[in-house]
């Protein structure tokens, strides 16, 4: 078969390929990752004309789409672990999509791939139709341009090439001259041979008719004279010896010039090789910098994606997780500092209460504010509710074990010590989850145990000192001193958002003797309630106690007790199961940082609030 026939046959085979129909348009509800606050949200997705668009709902399509991407250069990646999820990325834009089930996901992926294959970028037939002749021609032209330009750059090399051109002209002329000389010699020799044969024939006839040797001897001189005119000593005025010397000198000059040219080319090659090595090294550094920049850019563009948040298959490593959490906490601290300074500047000065002063006017009387329930209500035996037994057990356990000194216990580590405050921790892990019990002791002047526990338990002032809560509400009021609270904590990316459902109860434990003060305690422990089921947040489990004892130093003389004479000894214990998949090192670092800050912030708040109020024992 000829080339033309084979070409035509291959072309006909391509023409006979069945053409696929237009891609199928598809629309429906898919879950799309919006951001780390709202998470997955159902969206109406429309696929047509090589474009994927999404709307908030099917009813709002007439208001226009909320976003769209062209599928020509899109990369569709099914998720490795989540069978219902697939990602669509175009440059730095990434859509995270979840279908109802694996079959639903596969149908969407097939439809998207079909639209993509029909575009100019994804079609293989389009790549076959557009051959690579342009690149071949451009490569050939660039090669020829490089070859010619390299000879134009060296001035010495150009001069040597001119010398080679001159030597070539000289050598051609010398070859022509020598060729002419050799042709003349060849013609002369041929003519001499003919005349020599004729003379020899005449001589043979003469000797045959005159057999006398004297004639032969005398005729030899005549024969030498006969051939003198054909001697090629100087043909056409050509000096053979001179031409030979000149030819030798010309070839020697050519060889010398060639040697010089080769030397110049070797030097030039070395120079260009050094420049090439420098350019290769420069390109390597640029490519490395570009790769690092693209990696950082990709991280930033996907920073809020679901693959980079807390989870069993999170792509973020432990160090990056800690850095992100620490950066988020630092931002929150700055915001809290600005808000607290702004709030203090707007606080009105508390007017002094005339009833709260003695005749001397320098000390506060022991008087309970109207907003606080009297102690008799808090220890009333009529405190009946369904969690009463659990509350009593918790109070008894904390009074028995939480007040024990752990300073000499080898299982407890002193992690923070700032003035009167000491924070201890005992490392405990269960199934990879950090369950470290924490115990802190602190001593605060100018406040009583009742005041500290009252502000810690009272939900009306919770937002004044608690900065980690996003929102909370009382689910059920069990009794005057026991409530069930549901609260959601602020999200600290990349950690998942957490919520807590707990029972909070306040108690006063009477002193064993008249010389001792009563002990106040607030117990917060996790419970279940139908009105607060599990949701998208990670439900944490807690068992926390704030135990406060008041110490009084007698004033001099008959003076009344002032806040300068009182001191509150605080014991704070916390057993928290955070749940989720946060790294253990991150949880321990955050606990070490946040618990001391909480104690200092809360006790300072109580001191500020009670400074101008009567003492509440």
UniProtKB/Swiss-Prot annotation:
Q: What does this protein do?
A: May mediate the intracellular trafficking of ceramide in a non-vesicular manner.
Protein name, as recorded: Ceramide transfer protein
Fetch the InterPro entries from UniProt.
PH-like_dom_sf (IPR011993), PH_domain (IPR001849), STARD11_START (IPR041952), START-like_dom_sf (IPR023393), START_lipid-bd_dom (IPR002913), START_lipid_transfer (IPR051213)
Report motif location: FFAT: 320-326
Under PANTHER family, the record lists: CERAMIDE TRANSFER PROTEIN, PHOSPHATIDYLCHOLINE TRANSFER PROTEIN
Q: Name one GO cellular component term.
A: Golgi apparatus
Gene Ontology BP term (one)? ER to Golgi ceramide transport
Region (Disordered) residue ranges read 1-23, 341-382
